[in-house]
Amino acid sequence: MLVLGIETTCDETAAAVIERQADGSGRILSNIVRSQIAEHAPFGGVVPEIAARAHVEMLDVLVDRAMREAGVDFAQLDGIAAAAGPGLIGGVIVGLTTAKAIALVHDTPLIAVNHLEAHALTPRLTVPLAFPYCLFLASGGHTQIVAVLGVGEYVRIGTTVDDALGEAFDKVAKMLDLPYPGGPQVERAAREGDPTRFDFPRPMLGRKDANFSLSGLKTAVRNEASRLMPLELQDIADLCASFQAAVLDSIADRIRSGLRLFREQFGTPRALVAAGGVAANVAIRNALQEIAADDEITMIVPPPQLCTDNGAMIAWAGAERLALGLTDTMEAAPRARWKLDATTETPTKFINTRARH
């Protein structure tokens, strides 16, 4: 099964072709990503209109390149998958409309993919992984602990009550005048800092639920930075290191609660899986490895290039759904908001409904 995947939900324009084998394994034939960092850097963050225009300018070129690198033509494709949300609506429209046009011209099934579901299923592209597993999804817009029970079967165990993890990293970077994109800059500065200099709060520690809260931690960083003004380079490094240390402690506690709740409801997970752009953070990856080792379960984190937004994850999610007979009509709508667990409710615009519930 050959599937073209298109990703345009934020500030990466991406296209990829994957092959799904009969045994359920996958192979990436091409995976082209074009970042928009240069376009958004002058503004210190993603500007939705600029992002949408960049997608329009680049997507056709990237699709053509992905097809050429994969060595296939459109007639060979079994499906066209596009991220239909959640995300910046202008970009989502660009990608989904392009996918619809290709699917219509070549009479190929369309799969409108939930971007979060694509992150959730990516580990199955990289390693043989059976359901169920516990997912820690951390990105610029989402921080969740999810029970992944099957394709289209998701139960949210914990979520952030305020800022997403990636959002908190970006906001801390901005208040410290670090370049865009902020998350990697905070991680880089933290390597040179003292994580014990500032005793920042560890929100939600010890609670029985698995929810996250990061706004108080972010405020504590802002207050300390304001007190120290003007900031020296070592101050910035120490603030970043202390912030990241607090985040790691919070993540560890929240995930341990999530694993306990997972076991109570669904039994022992096959693995603890991390996905989303924040999962590319080395310190966070190492902390997750320690949690999994303590809990005596397998830890799976996709390669960094598959943690951040990319077309291969969209193509793979499309292939997983296509294998169950799940396709969409041309009326599939772009969505700015689309909860992952809402994917368990098969939309009426699916052609058939063989997903397991």
From Swiss-Prot:
What is this protein's name? Answer: tRNA N6-adenosine threonylcarbamoyltransferase
| GO molecular function terms listed in the Swiss-Prot or TrEMBL record | iron ion binding; N(6)-L-threonylcarbamoyladenine synthase activity
State how the cofactor is bound.
Answer: Binds 1 Fe(2+) ion per subunit.
Predominantly, its location class is: cytoplasm
The protein's enzyme class: transferase
What does this protein's UniProt record list under function?
A: Required for the formation of a threonylcarbamoyl group on adenosine at position 37 (t(6)A37) in tRNAs that read codons beginning with adenine. Is involved in the transfer of the threonylcarbamoyl moiety of threonylcarbamoyl-AMP (TC-AMP) to the N6 group of A37, together with TsaE and TsaB. TsaD likely plays a direct catalytic role in this reaction.
Origin organism is Afipia carboxidovorans (strain ATCC 49405 / DSM 1227 / KCTC 32145 / OM5)
User: Which amino acid positions bind Fe cation, per UniProt?
Assistant: 115, 119, 309
Quote the catalytic activity from the record: L-threonylcarbamoyladenylate + adenosine(37) in tRNA = N(6)-L-threonylcarbamoyladenosine(37) in tRNA + AMP + H(+)
